[in-house]
Amino acid sequence: MATEPAAPNDQQAASNGDWLSLWKPEDPVFWASTGSRIAWRTLLLTTISLVLSFSTWFLLSALAVNLTGIGVKFAEDPKDNDRLLFWLVAMPGLAGGTLRVIHTFMIPLFGTRKVITVSTLLKLIPCVGIAWAVMTPGTPYWIYMVLALLLGMGGGDFSSYMPSTSLFFPKRLQGTALGIQAGIGNFGVSLTQFVTPWIIGLAAFAAVTGGPQGLKTPTGEQSVWLQNAALWCVPLLIIIGAVCWMQLRSVPIKASFREQLDIFKDKHTWFCTITYVMTFGSFSGFAAAFPMLIKSLYGGFGPDSPKPLAYAFLGPLIGSTVRVLFGFVADKTGGAILTQLAGIGMIGICVAMAATGVLAPTSLETFPLFVWLMLGMFFFTGVGNASTFRQYPLIFAHNPRQGAQVLGWTGAVAAYGPFLFSAAIGETLGWTSQDGGVKSALPFFIAAAAFYLFAVAINWYYYSRNGCERPS
């Protein structure tokens, strides 16, 4: 009686220490004996690294609200200073999106082990640099801008993590694996916004960095070590970078740069890009802008004004949690219908914000409603983030390599969310407050609703309706 040949064990599959010699996740025998163990180990390590990536990428969103308080001013006029702070928060998004375009092509060229390890360790540069900048009085704006661009490395490598993970898992588990990794990775946004107000109050690195700064608040002055916001993840980056180098392996799917350009000939690459800008672009954009948006709209009402970081972390926390949970739901229901519902929900939130006046407040009375509506927006972005990543491998099921690259490419374009949202909101607030007018973010949210409507229409026509071109 013939027997199935034994699948290679872990060591045989990674005989050269980097590239796996064989990878067949769709083969039940291989998956049960070897593939599952390697894939889940890879998912664990790369997800931890991705959490740190998001934490560093959104570092300035948590730091910017306190820079003025310690005496860091880039303009004498408060309105101009706020606008410059919004641009500072936007820069990691600009760099992150651009670097994601590059990362889209890196896994087939260099493999998971090299790309993830190097990108993890590179983030040490901006973290140490930001700590130095806040400890050095008189650091010019251009240096902060350069460091902000370098923080974009934390956003750029997402487009290597996602294609890598999709290659390690069989199609039936891709939605779950991608949802777990992206969702838990997104927790890095909440982590940095939650940890910052706590750790800057501790002399955790004082032996190395020296004394505190004086932070002026509406209720007085307090001592803070603002550099700690950038330093807490430094030892973690070193540790996880070393572990990734020792433990990760690479799937033997290689393609030249020229071969990989074929994804741009498929119209569905561009349609997927639009729907992911709606979901992840909005999640990352609002996550970056939320603290400064709270400060700009509701920070001018005296001692009772809300502390932005007491609320800002809740949005990314909800969006990240929902993304993880709805990854499982999308595997059962399909992604297209959930993307449709998420987009409709986001449009509804924009309409509610426009109708209730929370975007142009004249008192703190509307602040609770504003927070609840923003949390609702994060909820729907989380649903959409999970569902779209379930859709894309199915839309490109005919070519797994293309499907993996589309995950990277869509993530690259959507990573411009922090740049586009922060810059656009900052300019909108500056424009509406000219000549003594009330600050308002209403024009931005009207434009966002129009774009969401366009994305929902594309998703319905090509992926959701009966008889659509590529059901997903």
Question: Can you describe what each PLM-predicted range is?
Answer:
Residues 60-65, 266-321, 385, 389-390:
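Extracytoplasmic gate region of multi-pass secondary transporters
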Residues 126, 140-156, 365-385:
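Hydrophobic core of transmembrane alpha-helices in multi-pass small-molecule transporters
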Residues 155, 175-201, 410-422:
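Glycine-rich segments within core transmembrane alpha-helices of 12-TM secondary carriers
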Residues 121-137, 344-365:
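C-terminal ends and interior cores of transmembrane alpha-helices
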Residues 86-105, 313-326:
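Central cavity-lining transmembrane alpha-helices of secondary-active solute carriers
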Residues 108-120, 331-346:
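Cytoplasmic membrane-interface "Motif A"-like loop-to-helix N-cap segments
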Residues 201, 232-253, 455-463:
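C-terminal membrane-cytosol helix-exit motif in multi-pass small-molecule transporters
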Residues 189, 399-434:
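A late C-terminal transmembrane helix in Major Facilitator Superfamily
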